[in-house]
A protein has these predicted regions:
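Short cysteine-rich clusters marking metal-coordination/redox-active sites
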Residues: 119-123, 181
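Short hydrophobic "helix-edge" motifs at membrane interfaces and signal-peptide entry regions
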Residues: 130-131, 173
């Protein structure tokens, strides 16, 4: 059963001509500053003129400062009479939960483990790495295998400098991967948090922060400019945008079930839920990707 993101919001934003119909919102964690909020609104809001953002009950528009954002109701006001604002029609992808189990993934997994050796989100080191025990640690794809065709259309292979050969599409490069604890990986895939490469790699949670990761910074081990295996900023930027769309636009995208014990009817769960066609297509491409030949 899909879960709602909007129910926990404590920030809402509006077109003042419709003051009781929010255009979207946000669950506020301490890492969200006024500057970051205004930047994220640029992903969601379209307008035919410049606009300013006002917290209701205050006398000045929001300035792009590093002061913490306050919870409440915000009006987006066009700077010229008759100005129009609207919400983008861009939508985040329907992403299945990644499962790295095929031969095609093995090189990716080994390279991410070798580079990171810890959860780069929480900072927790794997003390058993020396004996190749990676229980509860997962090599996560930033851009998912299920959307490899989109990866190609966006010309993202151009950013990858570390790959296995000329026929490699680069989506399985370690530069598209991060090592995480397994439960953190599920949160990453469900767009519950994201890393902002344009804010010093700060982590922002868009839901309750159970692991204390909001406001942390992506561990430097995976982004060392001197390491040819370093993670690609453009992929992190893409994931951050997807997370903003999933959490802040309209009522928010549903959070899909991820707890499937052995024998579960995953297909039945997908078909009976929202965005069924997109999710089925993504699941199919994800499975096909894992049985395709190793490049």
């Amino acid at each position: 059963m899909a879960m709602s993101r909007g129910v926990i919001r404590n920030v809402h934003f509006y077109d003042p001509s419709r003051p009781i119909e929010p255009l979207g919102g946000l669950y506020l964690n301490p890492s969200v500053t006024r500057r970051k909020f205004l930047r994220m609104l640029e992903v969601i809001i379209c307008a035919n003129s410049p606009y300013s953002v006002w917290l209701r009950g205050t006398d000045n528009p929001l300035a792009p400062t590093d002061d913490p954002l306050e919870s409440g109701h915000y009006d987006i006001v066009c700077s010229i009479p008759g100005g129009i604002i609207w919400v983008t029609d861009e939508r985040c992808i329907a992403r299945p939960f990644s499962r790295t189990v095929s031969k095609r993934d093995s090189r990716f997994r080994q390279q991410v483990r070798s580079r990171d050796r810890k959860c780069v989100i929480t900072g927790i080191i794997n003390p058993a790495a020396y004996r190749n025990d990676w229980t509860s640690f997962v090599a996560a794809h930033i851009f998912p295998l299920s959307h490899e065709q989109l990866f190609m259309r966006l010309n993202y292979p151009q950013y990858v400098t570390y790959r296995s050969g000329e026929t490699d599409t680069a989506i399985n490069s370690c530069q598209n991967g991060l090592l995480m604890r397994s439960h953190i990986h599920k949160q990453f895939d469900s767009f519950s948090f994201a890393i902002d490469p344009d804010d010093n790699y700060k982590i922002t949670c868009f839901s309750e922060d159970l692991d204390g990761i909001d406001g942390r910074f992506l561990d430097p081990v995976c982004r060392d400019p001197g390491d040819e295996r370093r993670v690609i900023d453009e992929f992190l930027r893409w994931h951050f945008r997807q997370t903003v769309l999933a959490n802040m636009k309209g009522n928010g995208e549903p959070i899909f079930e991820s707890d499937f014990p052995d024998g579960s009817d995953i297909v039945g769960e997908i078909v009976s839920g929202p965005r069924a066609a997109e999710r089925m297509e993504a699941e199919l491409f994800s499975r096909l990707n894992r049985i395709s030949p190793v490049p």
